[in-house]
Regions:
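Divalent metal-cofactor coordination and adjacent catalytic microenvironments
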Residues: 1-159
Length: 159
């Protein structure tokens, strides 16, 4: 279940990358990413303070856009042969004499999205940094920071 919808994406986050048709896919995937980052806290303790809930929704929107652009980079970086024998993908160079077209393997593009498209570690780092921008010091409904990954200090303290 996505933690936000296209209406919020357009009017609360003011996003313009996703369309109404594509937004359910990317908002749902972004919500899944946030569930992993927050250790599932959002599923049982979604913030009840409105300002905190808005931050979660904005995080979902920002992550959804990042996932969308990563997907665009993945598609663009791979030259694919179509059924008619033609190739589609990112063009690296074109020569006119004897007609030569070279397709990029994606390494020429140095954007964070291109890096994330070719590396799971880079994608995890990008999504994590986006989440941290929005969720730092935001508590869940039980008062636990959404990004808190530690144990119970009182339970482990020595006397």
């Amino acid at each position: 279940m996505a933690y936000t919808d296209f209406a919020f994406y357009g009017s609360g986050y003011f996003g313009d990358t996703l369309t109404e048709e594509t937004s359910p896919k990317w908002l749902e995937r972004a919500s899944d990413e946030l569930d992993a980052i927050t250790f599932g806290r959002l599923t049982f303790a979604f913030p009840t303070v409105e300002a905190h809930a808005v931050k979660v929704k904005k995080a979902v929107c920002a992550i959804a856009e990042a996932l969308y652009w990563i997907d665009v980079q993945r598609r663009a970086s791979s030259a694919q042969k179509a059924e008619d024998g033609s190739y589609h993908g990112a063009v690296a160079s074109i020569s006119s004499g004897r007609e030569s077209i070279s397709y990029s393997a994606g390494s020429a593009n140095s954007s964070v999205y291109a890096a994330a498209a070719t590396s799971a570690e880079a994608q995890t780092n990008l999504i994590g940094s986006i989440a941290a921008q929005y969720l730092a010091n935001i508590p869940d409904a039980n008062g636990v920071n959404l990004l808190y990954a530690g144990g119970c200090w009182a339970c482990t303290a020595t006397q």
